[in-house]
Amino acid sequence: XXVPYPRPFPRPPIGPRPLPFPGGGRPFQS
C-alpha cells in the first residue's frame, strides 16, 4: 500500500502512458 496523503493534491500531468492510479490523490507506492 501505499500510503494515502492527508490531503488530495492535484493530479500530475498526463504523460504518454496512463496514470498508475485513478484520481491522482494517492501516489503509487508499495
UniProtKB/Swiss-Prot annotation:
GO terms for biological process: defense response to bacterium. The keyword Ligase does not apply. Residues 1-21 have a biased composition (Pro residues). Coiled coil: none annotated. Keywords: Antibiotic, Antimicrobial. Residues 1-30 are annotated as: Disordered. The keyword tRNA-binding does not apply. To bovine bactenecin 7. On the 2D-gel the determined MW is: 6.5 kDa. Strong antimicrobial activity against P.immobilis and M.luteus, less active against E.coli D22. This is Antibacterial 6.5 kDa protein.
